């Protein structure tokens, strides 16, 4: 439940337009709301508001077909609006036709059931590949989800171990990528060929000359499927353990990629919050041996 007072500059606005422009709701998000104006239920989003009107919104209960399951959830950060999870590798985020349960989503539904007593929809703001570890944002309601998508800022940083010695300390990869046919693998494609704009900022953290490996930080400026994996492979530095883009390597059982830091706009205060987590054990053990 949220309450607002209409600001003078929005006098005469339609209630739907007001909520979209000032609160970050999408058209889809508005359909999930019960809206009250000065205590009376609003049945049409074209209803005009007046300055100092009181607005109360309630989110309609939404069911999910994802059943709760006892899947371990490592909470990196939580408040009344968001849950940030430190995802382990080797777990799928959301059910698919081939994998209908034992996913992270099943664990999140179970976590919410235990902590709130309700079956809540797991609203993932971002997802990670099965073999990628690290931070995933889960919005607790459609308002927060819409806010992050439409109004808020979210910055995502990864650490990765790549093959080869990356020469430049810092650089920007600006190469459009896309898939060809039904291939999982992303390739460099021009926009005309169906490629999507993709930008990744790279910074070298440490070079391991004897092992011919480099630990890098990658900041996503866009969010494309396999973006870091594809971009580093295109640059000639595939991720260690990434069989799809770099071939098999006995030193790693999975791609050495970890979402270690996320910055996001707090929906209540507008201030930026930073959440940072440590590397997973397999990446730490690999680096400590060097």
Regions found by a protein language model. Give the residues of each.
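Pseudouridine synthases involved in rRNA/tRNA modification
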Residues: 1-28, 206, 210-211, 221, ...
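RNA pseudouridine synthases
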Residues: 1-172, 176-178, 282-286
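Residues that recognize and position ribonucleotide moieties
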Residues: 126, 170-171, 195, 226, ...
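Short Pro/Gly-enriched beta-strand edge/turn motifs at strand-loop
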Residues: 57, 182-186, 197-199, 242-248
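Long C-terminal interaction/binding lobes of large macromolecular proteins
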Residues: 202, 216
């Amino acid at each position: 439940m949220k309450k607002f007072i209409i600001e003078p500059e929005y006098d005469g606005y339609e209630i739907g337009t007001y909520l979209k422009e000032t609160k970050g709701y999408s058209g889809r998000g508005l359909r999930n709301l019960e809206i009250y104006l000065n205590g009376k239920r609003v049945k049409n989003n074209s209803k005009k508001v007046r300055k100092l009107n009181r607005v109360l919104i309630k989110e309609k209960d939404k069911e999910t077909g994802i059943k709760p399951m006892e899947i371990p959830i490592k909470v990196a950060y939580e408040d009344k609006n968001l849950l940030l999870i430190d995802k382990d590798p080797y777990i799928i985020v959301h059910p698919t036709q081939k994998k209908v349960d034992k996913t992270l989503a099943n664990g999140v539904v179970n976590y919410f059931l235990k902590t709130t007593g309700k079956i809540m929809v797991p609203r993932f703001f971002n997802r990670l590949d099965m073999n990628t570890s690290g931070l995933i944002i889960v919005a607790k309601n459609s308002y927060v989800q819409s806010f992050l998508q439409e109004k808020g800022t979210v910055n995502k940083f990864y650490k990765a171990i790549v093959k080869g010695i990356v020469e430049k300390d810092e650089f920007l990869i600006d190469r459009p990528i896309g898939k060809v046919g039904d291939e999982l693998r992303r390739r460099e494609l021009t926009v005309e060929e169906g490629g999507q704009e993709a930008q990744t900022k790279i910074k070298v953290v440490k070079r391991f000359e004897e092992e011919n490996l480099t630990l890098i930080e990658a900041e996503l400026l866009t969010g494309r499927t396999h973006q870091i994996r594809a971009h580093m492979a295109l640059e000639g530095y595939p991720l260690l353990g990434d069989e799809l883009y770099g071939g098999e390597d006995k030193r790693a059982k999975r791609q050495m990629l970890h979402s270690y830091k996320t910055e996001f706009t707090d929906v209540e205060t507008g201030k930026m919050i930073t959440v940072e987590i440590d590397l997973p054990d397999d990446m730490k053990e690999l680096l400590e041996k060097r």
